[in-house]
Amino acid sequence: MSKEIKAQVVVLGSGPAGYSAAFRCADLGLETVLVERYSTLGGVCLNVGCIPSKALLHVSKVIEEAKAMADHGVVFGEPQTDINKIRIWKEKVVNQLTGGLSGMAKMRNVTVVNGYGKFTGPNSILVEGEGESTVVNFDNAIVAAGSRPIKLPFIPHEDPRIWDSTDALELKEVPEKLLIMGGGIIGLEMGTVYHSLGSKVEVVEMFDQVIPAADKDIVKVYTKRIKDKFKLMLETKVTAVEAKEDGIYVSMEGKKAPAEAERYDAVLVAIGRVPNGKLIDGEKAGLEIDERGFINVDKQMRTNVPHIFAIGDIVGQPMLAHKGVHEGHVAAEVISGKKHYFDPKVIPSIAYTEPEVAWVGKTEKEAKAEGIKYEVATFPWAASGRAIASDCSDGMTKLIFDKETHRVIGGAIVGTNGGELLGEIGLAIEMGCDAEDIALTIHAHPTLHESVGLAAEVFEGSITDLPNKKAVKKK
C-alpha cells in the first residue's frame, strides 16, 4: 500500500534538531511533515542517548553518595540493586518525554510519517514503513538524519557481549569485568554507571588523557577522583578483539598495554560516531555529501541545493543535541523568510560524570593554537564553604581572559553539578563581558555558583577568599 502527500516542509529525522525544526516551522505557519524511522520521536538523544544515560547516572550518583555518607556518621546497608526496576525507571523517563513530543506534534498539526526516508529527487522523499510506503513531495526539506556509532572492521560487533552506547543503555546485565574502548564522554558516563552497579571497569584511550578536548588541568582533577574506580590505560590502543566462549579477549599496544590479551565479560566500543549522510540517497536530490557522510552547509544551514537544509550531527562537529536544536531553529526561520544565521560564539560541552567536567568557549590549547594572548584565573573549591560543606571540595572553576581586553573568552568547571554552573560563563562570553562585569555581579553565598565570580576576582586582583597575588605590595 502506498500514498502520496504534499508539504511545504519535510524534516527527515526527529532527534532534537529535527523535532525542533519541525515544531518551529509549524509555529511559523508552514505545513510540515516529520519523518522518523522509529516508532517514537526524539532520536538518539531521547531514546538511546542523553536522556536514558542521565536517568542511569542519577541512580549511580545516589548509590555513591549513600556510600560516602558513612564518613559523616550516616551508614546505609549495602545497596541492593534490581536492574529490572532500574531499567523500568529509565524507560519511564524516556516514555514521558517521547510521549510529550508526540503530543506537541499533534497540537501543532505536524504530520508524523514513520518509516525509513530516502530522497528520490530534489523535491520528493520516499518513506518505507511497515506495510506501507509514503511519497512526500515538498517545497523545502531539512535533513536531520543524525549519526550512528563507529564500528571497527577488526571487532566482531555481532557478538552480544560487544556493545555500542545503545547496548550499554539497555542495561541487560552488569558484567563482572567491563572494558571501555575510548576515554571520551560517552564511555566515561557509561563507566560511571556500571562501576556503581558493581562492574570492574577498565578504560583504554589512545591519547595521553581522557576527555581529550578538555584542558589537562581540568581533566587532572577528574582523573584524581576516579583513580580508585577505573583502571585507565592511556596512550594505549586496541589491536585485536577475539570472542571466545568464556569471554572477549582484547589485545593492546602502547604505554599501559597488558603483556597478554586480557579477558573481559563485555566490551563497550565508544570511539565516536559517524554521520548518516550516505544512508539517505542524497545524491538523487543533488546534495553534496563528503566521503565521511557529512553534508556541508552555510550559516543559514542551507546545502548546495537552495531549498534543502541540513542540521545536527550530519553537518559536523560538535555532535551535540543543543547545537542541533539551534541549527533547527535557524533553518526554520530562514525557510519562513527571516534573515537568521547560525553564528554562536560558544557551544558548551559537558561530561556528566562524577565529578562533572564542563567547558565552554576557548580552551587553553585552542587559545595557544590561535595565538591569543590570554590569562587564566582559577578558584579552587577547597576554598568554597559550600563545596566543603557538601563534601565536593576537590572541584575547580577556571576562567580564561583575553589579556588585552580582559574579556572572558573561555571557562571550565570540574566538580559536582559543574554542567549546571556553566551557563553564566557561556552567557558572559556571548555578551562580551569582561572580568570586572563578572566580579562586580553579586553572587549568592554560600553557593558553588559563586566560584565563577570569585575566579573573576582572582583575575581582577580583588579576591579576599584566597591569598591575593595581585595585592599592592607595601613599601
From Swiss-Prot:
GO terms for cellular component: cytoplasm. The active site is at residue 445. Disulfide bonds join 45-50. InterPro entries: Class-I_Pyr_Nuc-Dis_Oxidored, FAD/NAD-bd_sf, FAD/NAD-binding_dom, FAD/NAD-linked_Rdtase_dimer_sf, Lipoamide_DH, Pyr_nuc-diS_OxRdtase, Pyr_nucl-diS_OxRdtase_dimer, Pyr_OxRdtase_I_AS. GO terms for molecular function: dihydrolipoyl dehydrogenase (NADH) activity; flavin adenine dinucleotide binding. FAD binds at residues 36-45, 54, 117, 313, 321. This is Dihydrolipoyl dehydrogenase. It comes from Vibrio parahaemolyticus serotype O3:K6 (strain RIMD 2210633).
